[in-house]
Each structure stands twice: as structure tokens, then as C-alpha cells.
Amino acid sequence: MINDRIKMLREQYNYSQADLAKKLNIARTSVLAWENQTSDPAMKHIIALAKLFRVSTDYLLEIDDKRTLSLEGLSDEEISILCDLLNYFDKERTT
């Protein structure tokens, strides 16, 4: 469920609930409610979460389990570094 994805991504980014709430300009209790499955985020918050975590809205909503990473806003140098890291991890898995 989206609630689990929000918590997982928040933890992967090492954000507290308060950190995430501040980034979204909402109350910490809203993040708590999402993660506890007592409410679901509005579409504008789903879009904001997807942008913040650089994933698709489909991934957040569990329509698609493929986790894609948005490179929007990254410089060519940053993209090159990411590609080098991915290649390194691919080689490590195969050796």
C-alpha cells in the first residue's frame, strides 16, 4: 500500500516524519496518519512525494513495482556518476 511505500522511502532517505512534513509543508501528524493507514495523501501530496523521492506516482501507488529513478534536474556530471555506480554494482553482482 502507499502507506508502506511512503514509510520505506522516508526511512531510505533518513527523514524523520517531521523532516518529511516540513519538506511537504504539512503537519507531522499527516505523515503519521499516512504511515498508520488512518488516511491517504491527497493527489497533490502523492505528486510531491514522487518528486521528492524521485520515483513515479505509479510506484508510490503500487500500480507498478518497478522503481525508477528520475534524473530530472541532475547535471550531466551527476548522471555520469550515477551510471558509473550502477555499472560498478552490476559488476559486483556478477563476480
Give, region by region, the residue ranges found by the protein language model:
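DNA major-groove recognition helix of helix-turn-helix
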Residues: 35, 45, 61-64
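Interfacial/linker helices and their anchor residues that mediate assembly or domain coupling
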Residues: 64-95
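Conserved amphipathic alpha-helical interaction elements at protein-protein interfaces in regulatory
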Residues: 12, 52-55, 88-91
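A short, Lys/Arg-rich alpha-helix, primarily the initiator
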Residues: 1-12
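Short alpha-helical DNA-recognition segment
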Residues: 14-36, 48
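DNA major-groove recognition helix of helix-turn-helix/homeodomain DNA-binding modules
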Residues: 24-25, 42-59
